[in-house]
Amino acid sequence: MNHYKDFISNLIENLGSENVKTNELMKNHTSFKVGGPVDILVTPESYEQVQYVIKHSRGNNIPYFIMGNGSNLLVRDGGIRGLVIKFCKLNRIKIEDDKIIAQSGVLLSKVSNMAAKNNLEGLEFASGIPGSIGGALTMNAGAYNGEISQVIDSALVLDKSGEILNLSKEELELGYRTSSILKNGYVVLEAILKLSLGDSKNIYDRIKELTEKRKTKQPLEYPSAGSTFKRPQGYFAAKLIEESGLKGINVGDAEVSQKHSGFIINKGNASAKDILNVINIVQDTVKSKFDVELHTEVLIIGEDKLN
């Protein structure tokens, strides 16, 4: 950590000590509740601070990773070398007519609730998605036949040179769990969503219906990262996993959920290694039984722990 000394001092000077942490356990920042320490964790409060941190990191050849709410993230037990930039303090949100302008760190569920309060429809599907708007836009998150591409108008992003770009819906190139943001290594700063005026009762009824569905069908009582695998073309991942006889299989406290086999859950004290072992078992078994490759929807980062 000594070689980071001047780098950390500069970060503290520009962001304040309350926004710079060292040796921070990532298990405290992910919905899976696993993950070793990151060397440095920063929580910028403005776009200028984001630009500064990225420029400063690049200038010092220090690798960095940008995260939102950590709800689609599996951090290995050895943690992360370099820097994690967490956008939780970029959380301002406002409404202009039928548009919602939300900074990257705002939770998607909060945006959905704000839309409902203002009789704006189109975001009911997102009421139970735990991620941030930045992460949701990057991955074109969706659920129950709805996805971000249906409501996005435009977005402010930071490109690799540190310039702020305003991208139209077309320029965002949103597809199934992908976008131009992901392909080009852009960073979402702000999303502008375009909704339509609806009936308050219908909006809340739909949110209630989807909430009940989630509670009934998903293992919300345990830490997880939501759907572990992307949907393979022509199949449903959960159905393949169940038909492979893998429901309930476990390594330590990591388990394929009995409630929904598309979820791998942490039943208590699972390590990232346990979860990765379950992922590998599922992938290998489904491949040998159905000749279908399952790719993870959850993002896996960091280093393995040295024994």
From Swiss-Prot:
Keyword field: Cell cycle, Cell division, Cell shape, Cell wall biogenesis/degradation, Cytoplasm, FAD, Flavoprotein, NADP, Oxidoreductase, Peptidoglycan synthesis
Known EC number: 1.3.1.98
Coiled coil regions in record: none
Residues covered by the FAD-binding PCMH-type domain: 33-198
Pfam families: FAD_binding_4, MurB_C
Catalyzed reactions per annotation: UDP-N-acetyl-alpha-D-muramate + NADP(+) = UDP-N-acetyl-3-O-(1-carboxyvinyl)-alpha-D-glucosamine + NADPH + H(+)
Biological process annotations from GO: cell division; cell wall organization; peptidoglycan biosynthetic process; regulation of cell shape
Broad class of where this protein is predominantly found: cytoplasm
NCBIfam families for the chain: murB, PRK13905.1
Listed name of the protein: UDP-N-acetylenolpyruvoylglucosamine reductase
Species of origin: Clostridium tetani (strain Massachusetts / E88)
Organism taxonomic ancestry: Bacteria, Bacillati, Bacillota, Clostridia, Eubacteriales
